[in-house]
Amino acid sequence: MPEQSSIPTIPTLSDAYTYALDAWQRSILFLDVMRQRGAQYEEHTAQTAPNVLDYEAELVCDGRKLDRPVNYALVRIVPPAGAVIDPLKKPFVVVDPRAGHGPGIGGFKADSEIGVAIKAGHACYFIGFLPEPVPGQTIEDITRSEAIFLETVIARHPDADGKPCVIGNCQAGWAVMILASLRPELFGPIIIAGAPLSYWAGIRGQYPMRYSGGLLGGSWLTALTGDLGAGIFDGAWLVQNFENQNPANTLWTKQYNLYSKVDTEAGRYLGFERWWGGHVRLNAEEMQFIVDELFVGNKLAAGKIQTSDGTTIDMRNIRSPIVVFCSKGDNITPPAQALDWILDLHDSVDEIRAHGQTIVYTVHEKIGHLGIFVSAGVARKEHDEFASNIDLIDVLPPGLYEAVLEPVGPAVENPDLVSGEWIMRCEARTLDDIRAFGGNDLEDDRRFAAAARVSEINLALYRTYLQPWIKGMVTPPMAEAMRSMHPLRLQYEVFGPGNPVMAWVEAAAGLIRDARQPVAPDNPLLALQENMSRQVVDGLEAWRQMVEHLSEQKFREIYGAPALQAALGIDTQTDRPPRQAAKNCWHHALLENKIAALKADMAKGGIREALARALLFVGMARGRVDERGFEAVRRLRRAHPSAKQLTLAEFKALMRTQYFMLLVDEEAALAAIPKLLPEKIEERGAAFAALREVLEAPGLLTGIAAERLQSVKALFGLSGEAPVPLMVRKVAR
C-alpha cells in the first residue's frame, strides 16, 4: 500500500494512462481467478470424499459400515518423507468441524495442527466426513462412531505412553467434549480450539451473534429450513451466517485484496476458497439438536442433555486435561463462550480439583475465528507448543491454569531445556481470572432463558400448524433445486466453465500475463483507489456496528420485559443462574471416601513418593509449571535407568496422588516424608540434588519457594550436608 502524502498529488496524463492500463489488466486477471475458482468448485464438489488435507491419508474405519452408520470416517495421516514418528508417543487425532464446510482445515498445510504434531514425532489421525449425511443419522450416532474410532486408534498403538490427544476445532470441540463426558477412558489430553461451550455468554456491545436466535423467534426457522430441504439442512446457510458477521470482508475486502494483489495473491486465495466453497449437508434432525440443545438452549454445561438411554452428559466426568484455545478477536466464539462453561460447572478452583480436572486455557489477543486453526503463525506458536509439551500438560496437577508463551531470548535461563522458539509455562489461575474476560450478569441470563422458552413455544406451534403443510408440499427434487439456487453456490457457478460468457477470459488472461505492466507504487491514482477502498470498508463497518447495536438493544428490550418473563415462568427472585449445573450428592460421598484413603496412605511408599511430594510442595509456592522443569525430569529418567520404570500414566497418577495428599492435609503429608526416605544419607543427598536440579531449571528459587526448599532439605535430614549435584543438563536428549 503506498504511503499517503498530506498534500494530494495531481495525476498527470501519464499517471492516468498507466493506472488505466493496470486497472484493465487487473480486472481481466481478477476475472480469470474467478474462472479458476468456479472450475475448482465444480471439480471439488464432484469428488466422492472432497477434502483439503495437504497430506496423504489411508482409510482406517468407514463410519458407513458401522451398526449405526454415519457419514464419518477415520483416516491415518501418512507422514511425509523425512518425518520421524516415535511409536512410544501418544497419537494425535484431529476432529474437523462440520459447520457448513468440508473437512481438512486442520491439515490444510504444513504449518497446521497435523503438521506440528507430525513434526513433534506423533502419529496422526483425522476424523472427517462426507458431504452427504447417512439418512437418519443423529448427533448421538456420530458420537458413538467417534468412540469406535478412538478405540481403533488406541488398539493400533499399544506401546504408546498414554491415550490419544484429541483436537476438536470449532463445532467439533463440543462434539469431542460430549464424547469425553460419556467415555472419559478413551482420551488423553483434549485441545478445543475456537469451540463454543457456553452459548449465551458474551460482553455487552460485542459479539452479537448470540442474539440472532432470539431475534428470529428461536429454532422454528431451523425446522422450516430443514423441511424446505426435504429433511436435509443445507450447510451453505451456516456459511452465509458466518459471512454476515463481517460484511466489510464478505462484500469488499476479500475480493478487493485479490484484485489489488492479483499478481501474487491468486494461489492463496484459491487455496482458501477450495475449502470455503465446499458446502456440506446435515440431516434436519442433526441441526435441530444443535440449535435446540446447544445454541438456543445452552444445555451442555448445565448437564441437561441426555442420551437415548438416559445417560446425562456431564462435562465434570472428563478426567483428561482440557486445553482451551480462544481469541479476543474471534467474534464467532469469543473468550466468554469458550471459557464460561467452567463457571457454569464449578463454584471454585477447589471444586475443579475435587473433580480431578485439569483445565488449561490460553487467549490470543487478536486472531480471528478461522485463524485459530488456519493461521500458519498460530500453528508455529500455540499449536507447536501444545504438541511439544503435551506430556507436561498431561501430568499437571488438577486445577485451573493459563498457558503463557514467552519467546526464548538471551536472558532466558537454561535455554537448552527448551524445545522450540517459545517457553511454555502453565500459571495457576482462579475463577476470577475467567470472569475478568467479561460475561453475562443474572439479568442477561434471564433474558436468554426467556428467549429459549419462546423458541420452544414457537417450535411447537410450527410443528403443529405449519410443518405438516410444508412437508406435504416439498419434494426431494424441489429441495435440490432450491439448494442449487443458493446465492453462495451461484457465486461460484456464474464464473465457472459452464458460463459461455467466461469462455474468452482464460486466453485473454494469458496474453495479459505476457505483457503485464503494473502501475508504479507512487501513482497518485493508486493512492486514490486505496483511499476509496478504505472508505467502502469504513462505511460497511459503520453499517455492521449500527445493526449490531440495534440487535442487542432490541433483544434486551424484548426479552428483558418483566411481563414477558413472568408469562414464560422465568424465576426473577432466585440468585441462581438459569443454566448452572446442579451438584451431585454422590460425588460428595465419594470424595469423603477418597480423602479418608489419602490420609491413610500418606506414610506409604518410598523415595518416588517423597520426591514427588516435595517437588509439588515447593512448586506450589511458585504458582506455575515450566516446560524446562519437565524436561529436566525427562533427562533425569534417561540418566538413571531405575527411574524409567514408571510410564507416563503411572507418573501422572503418582503426581496426582501426592498433590491431593498435600491439599487434604499439608502438615501431615510433609511430616510423613522422612518415613519414605532411604536410610543412607548419600542416597538422600543424591535425591535432593535431583529435586533441586528440576526445581531450578526455570531459574533460581526465591521467596517462599526458596524457604520451602530449605524445609524439604531439613526433612531429608540434610541440613548440615552439601548435596552432590547431578549434572542432568549434560545428559543427551
UniProtKB/Swiss-Prot annotation:
The UniProt record lists the keyword Membrane: yes
User: Which branch of life, at top level?
Assistant: Bacteria
UniProt KW keywords: Membrane, Transmembrane, Transmembrane helix
Q: Which Pfam families match?
A: DUF3141
List, alphabetically, the GO terms of the cellular component aspect: membrane
Q: Where in the cell is it found?
A: Membrane
> What InterPro entries does this protein's entry cite?
AB_hydrolase_fold (IPR029058), DUF3141 (IPR024501), PHA/PHB_synthase (IPR051321)
Membrane topology term reads: Single-pass membrane protein
Mark the transmembrane ranges. Answer: 174-194
This one is known as: Uncharacterized protein in ackA 5'region
The species this protein belongs to is Rhizobium meliloti (Ensifer meliloti)
What is the phylogenetic placement of the source species in the record? Bacteria, Pseudomonadati, Pseudomonadota, Alphaproteobacteria, Hyphomicrobiales
